[in-house]
């Protein structure tokens, strides 16, 4: 199942993103917390966003949460976990089984991160959703598969798993064998986009491309996931100002065509 992440069409309004995503043939959509925040800035309640998404007829693959809670403590931790619970409620109302969080960008205590993951897992479980946690290749500490896998493994919560993002896997130098070493039970969700072959800049990640345009071995990765038995959504998350400047319907169609060209024949 293939979903389009709303960040991919960031310069397009949410109603148009939903219409374009469905018309292009995607199976679902991934929502961000900022989609709700932008609506609130226009005086629209979260309930209105939920009605809009439900009316689109699209399945919701995942709902993003506010990041920063992994190393947080005291009042900021409480605030972020309250926001986390709110995103879980939205996901549940949309009949979406997954919420995702990017890793914290700075540095902190890994034991605290695992403890906070366990608490977040309890919140997710209470809403009957699963938390998928992503490492960010451009973060200071939680920037590779090994370290994030360690945090999640130490948390040992059945409602928490890894989010594998091909862009961050590629930028961090993860090998196919390292990805293959991750058991199916550890994988909660998948996001994907390609990494440019040249021109990469440390700390910058708004250069993502459709499959086949860069250095990620998509056919091998998709085959690997298929062989493992992963049958959840794979979400195309490709923020790129060059794409935002183009007609959104073209971006959505081209990305889906590029993705399908890399999928195993059975998919």
How does the language model describe each region?
Residues 1-5, 60-71, 201:
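N-terminal small/glycine-rich loop or linker at the start of catalytic domains
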Residues 1-3, 10-25, 50, 56, ...:
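Histidine-acidic metal/acid-base catalytic patches
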């Amino acid at each position: 199942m293939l979903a389009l992440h709303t960040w991919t069409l960031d310069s397009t309004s949410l109603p148009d993103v939903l219409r374009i995503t469905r018309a292009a043939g995607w199976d679902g959509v991934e929502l961000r917390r900022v989609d709700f925040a932008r609506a609130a800035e226009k005086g629209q309640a979260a309930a209105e966003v939920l009605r809009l998404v439900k009316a689109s007829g699209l399945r919701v693959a995942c709902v993003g949460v506010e990041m920063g809670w992994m190393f947080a403590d005291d009042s900021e931790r409480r605030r972020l976990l309250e926001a986390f619970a709110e995103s879980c409620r939205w996901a549940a109302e949309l009949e979406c089984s997954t919420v995702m969080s990017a890793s914290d960008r700075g540095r902190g205590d890994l034991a605290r991160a695992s403890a906070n993951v366990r608490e977040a897992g309890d919140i997710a479980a209470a809403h009957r959703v699963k938390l998928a946690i992503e490492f960010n290749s451009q973060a200071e500490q939680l920037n590779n598969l090994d370290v994030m896998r360690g945090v999640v493994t130490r948390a040992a919560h059945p409602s928490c798993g890894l989010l594998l993002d091909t862009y961050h896997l590629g930028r961090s130098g993860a090998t196919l064998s390292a990805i293959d070493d991750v058991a199916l039970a550890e994988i909660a969700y998948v996001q994907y986009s390609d990494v440019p072959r040249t021109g990469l800049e440390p700390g910058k990640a708004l250069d993502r491309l459709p499959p086949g345009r860069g250095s990620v071995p998509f056919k091998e990765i998709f085959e690997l996931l298929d062989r493992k038995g992963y049958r959840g959504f794979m979400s195309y998350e490709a923020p790129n100002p060059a794409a935002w400047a183009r007609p959104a319907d073209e971006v959505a169609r081209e990305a889906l065509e590029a993705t399908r060209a890399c999928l195993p024949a059975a998919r």
